[in-house]
Amino acid sequence: MFAYKLLVDERGKRYLLKKNVEKFGTDLGIVDMKDIEEGVELKSHKGHTFYLVEPTMFDILKRMKRTVTTLLPKDIGFIIARAGIREGETVVEAGTGSGALTMYLSNAVGKTGKVITYDIRPEFAKVARKNLLRVGAIKKGQKIIGLDEEFDDEDEIEIEDGLFNVIQKIGDVREKIDEKDVDVIVLDLPDPWNVVENAKKALNKKRGRIVTYLPYIEQVKKTVEKLKEEGFWDIHTYEIIEREIEISEKGVRPSTRMIGHTGYITVARVPPEPLDREEEKE
């Protein structure tokens, strides 16, 4: 499903490699991977142990090329779970950034779903395109809507079992959201309150949800006020803190390091259409 394979040495150090890499060298020696599929234990020419396995999206996210600070898995996972994003849904995202959240959204909606991701910066969209291509979220040669540019993907690995469910656009959702009957809108923008009215028009009134991700509480307050003004309901804001647990022969304890504040996640539902009983009688 991905254009990568993962090589892990006996110390736990990970190397994300393109599928077509046949040999790879580290301080522990050279590993020969020619004609070898993932799922095996290998020895370097120095006798050190390596595992060759398929990477997860988490492995790729940690090592992919970035143009901006990306959302972390702790926040991405919560967004998908709390918004209830599922197979077959249509999700609009803005902005794309490096494509980290886009990858996970693609995975969540599956082959029968669709992710339309907007960014106003062509240079960011092009970096994201490369990342999305290598996880099978878009096809080779696929264009970015709104960008008059052809892409030469000849050197990229063909992914036959990709999801191919992402559409990239250059556009400003503050001005317009082209899509209608959208299930979920996810906004990673500094001023989502300027998008709320357009989001309200685009969302499916039966099940539409909106998610915003913001670093500052003042931004959250302004966003929530606008959501309420536009009739959005079931509004909740969260902060996710991550701390790993260390397990050793001595005992079990929380790690002294933790991932604290990264951003605030606000989730809300679009207001349903009011039912006019008089019109119903007529």
UniProtKB/Swiss-Prot annotation:
Any one GO molecular-function label of the UniProt entry: tRNA (adenine(58)-N1)-methyltransferase activity
GO cellular component, one term: tRNA (m1A) methyltransferase complex
Gene3D superfamilies with a match to the protein in the record: 3.10.330.20, Vaccinia Virus protein VP39
Keyword Amino-acid biosynthesis: no
UniProt keyword terms in alphabetical order: Methyltransferase, S-adenosyl-L-methionine, Transferase, tRNA processing
EC nos: 2.1.1.219
Binding site for S-adenosyl-L-methionine: S98, G99, A100, L101, D119, D172, D188
CDD domains on file: AdoMet_MTases (cd02440)
Keyword ATP-binding attached: no
InterPro entries registered for this protein in UniProt: SAM-dependent_MTases_sf, TRM61_C, tRNA_MeTrfase_Gcd14
Function in brief: Catalyzes the S-adenosyl-L-methionine-dependent formation of N(1)-methyladenine at position 58 (m1A58) in tRNA.
Family affiliation: Belongs to the class I-like SAM-binding methyltransferase superfamily. TRM61 family.
Comment, domains: Contains a large catalytic C-terminal domain that binds S-adenosyl-L-methionine and a smaller N-terminal domain that may play a role in tRNA recognition. Domains are connected by a linker region.
Protein name per the record: tRNA (adenine(57)-N(1)/adenine(58)-N(1))-methyltransferase TrmI
